[in-house]
Regions:
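N-terminal accessory interaction module
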Residues: 1-15
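Acidic/His-rich, divalent-metal-binding segments that scaffold phosphate/diphosphate chemistry
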Residues: 17-150, 154-164, 168
Length: 168
């Protein structure tokens, strides 16, 4: 048991006396973030509703994100806000953070691109399930809901099976 818990302390808050003097430093400009979210939303929805339209346009988004991250100052400190987001905002944020980490690890451009593509597609199967998953704790879900949620990985894989442009 960690020392803090043994003292009966359940949570800790750190006050930053300089917080009011700092400006938020997002990974990318909020307008660019919103543009990415809208592109991801449009692509995922058109794939669902238009008989399997190719997801190849994710290549362009992946390249744009890698380019935007590469253009950032190298030693920038990024603020990450806790917030509720939808599937599309989550997808873009995971992609941005992952490419940022890949850059810090000095991975080559091809690996950063593959990471971006994987992140953009990592939850595509959630578009095919019928159970509610947003803001949900599945530790107390009934077996049928848990089974339905877990299907998103298989459904996502199946949705990508015909996409020949994705690296093996």
């Amino acid at each position: 048991m960690p020392l803090i818990e043994s003292l009966g302390i359940e949570s800790v808050m750190v006050e930053d006396p300089y917080e009011n003097y700092e400006s938020q430093n997002s990974i990318v400009d909020p307008a660019i973030f919103d543009k990415y979210v809208e592109k991801v939303r449009r692509l995922m929805e058109s794939h669902i509703y238009h008989d399997g339209k190719s997801l190849k346009e994710f290549e362009i988004i992946a390249n744009d994100i890698v380019h935007d991250i590469n253009d950032m100052p190298y030693d920038v400190i990024v603020d990450i806000k806790e917030r509720n987001s939808d599937l599309y905002e989550h997808t873009v944020m995971v992609t941005l953070l992952s490419v940022l980490v890949a850059r810090k690890l000095k991975l080559d451009e091809k690996r950063k691109y593959n990471i971006a593509v994987g992140c953009l597609l990592h939850d595509i199967g959630l578009r095919f399930i019928v159970t509610r998953y947003k803001n949900r704790d599945f530790s107390n879900a009934n077996p049928a809901e848990l089974f339905e949620y877990k299907k998103h990985t298989i459904l996502g894989y199946s949705a990508l099976d015909e996409e020949s442009w994705i690296a093996p």
